């Protein structure tokens, strides 16, 4: 077939070269955005008198017809037409005649594709924000049910101090809230229109870029035409934000995997989010959590792939930039899927409160309470730390825990120990007493939950 750009050429490209250079297999995902951008462009052309109102109306009707066909998956794309832009333009000309060729007046595929991707990410970032909010609501619900569920808190994967399970869950809530903030902030840079920048230098036609930007609900336009068509930092920022989000939920998945093991038995996954073994009939594997953990590397890879593509590109457009889309599409699909699975997995899991509580009574995670007890009685904390360290060593040799040590033994270590010591050794008491701002104390958790509910829209401010 003849190319829409073929006037300069005397030879046809090899079929395999066309296939290698074509992007229609993946950029057809931008068909909605491409048509919407074209409608705004032709309306601007009519406003500026570059095409007649009748021509614009005919082109607009043709584009709207193609958009409806696209929604019903009735469009047939061809490799010969290379990409979504030329496919749509070819279909438009076939639909309404040669007047369809006026659509591309004052525009290049360079600013066209950049516009498409800005429109695409503007929509998808908001979808991801909404999905994060749904996951946050699940975390709030689980936290409310587990304010007084006591579990070991860990450092170095060693039991450190007793905490509320709700406190642990809410840690991820606030990580996700920062992810939301990053995505929201990125919209300032995504919601800018490159349309009208042309190939690189603008156009001689008297276009109105601000008008087409307004029609597409952009907040502004790129100030430099070279910048508008050359950079993909808005995609890189999206991939970076998505990588951080995936890192957060991957860490949570790692803990869910550990907690669901026989060694912990803190939670049990719903059968809906687990699988079995083809050989071992007893197995219940946390495959969905493992897949999310694995797919995190995939999202990281998409970020580093585009960074590597971009690092040596001179201005303005280069064909290398065709490689900017597949990683973007893949990341959107991966992130949305992982958030959906994560919410369902957390909503349906069973929390084994008894096992968590039992675990925290069979360790030395209350040792800090003993050191704080001595410090509150005036002993320098470093001396208190030394004394409690010796007490722990004594207990490990005897095979007992701090609650099992008789008062006489405590007094041998320090005369400051009194009967009231045993009141602070209880894990429940230890958690309740940690009432500093942001701590695991029950009052602090309830306050944190109120803030969290406001953020996810469950309650309104007075």
Swiss-Prot record:
It is an enzyme of class 4 (lyase). It holds the Pfam family Lyase_1. The keyword Nuclease does not apply. Its EC number is 4.3.2.1. GO terms for cellular component: cytosol. PROSITE patterns: FUMARATE_LYASES. It comes from the Bacteria. InterPro entries: Arg_succ_lyase_C, Argininosuccinate_lyase, Fumarase/histidase_N, Fumarate_lyase_CS, Fumarate_lyase_fam, Fumarate_lyase_N, L-Aspartase-like. Keywords: Amino-acid biosynthesis, Arginine biosynthesis, Cytoplasm, Lyase. Pathway: Amino-acid biosynthesis; L-arginine biosynthesis; L-arginine from L-ornithine and carbamoyl phosphate: step 3/3. It is found in: Cytoplasm. One of its GO terms (molecular function) is argininosuccinate lyase activity. The keyword Nucleus does not apply. GO terms for biological process: arginine biosynthetic process via ornithine; L-arginine biosynthetic process. Transmembrane segments: none annotated. It catalyses: 2-(N(omega)-L-arginino)succinate = fumarate + L-arginine. Belongs to the lyase 1 family. Argininosuccinate lyase subfamily. This is Argininosuccinate lyase. It comes from Bacillus cytotoxicus (strain DSM 22905 / CIP 110041 / 391-98 / NVH 391-98). The lineage of its organism: Bacteria, Bacillati, Bacillota, Bacilli, Bacillales.
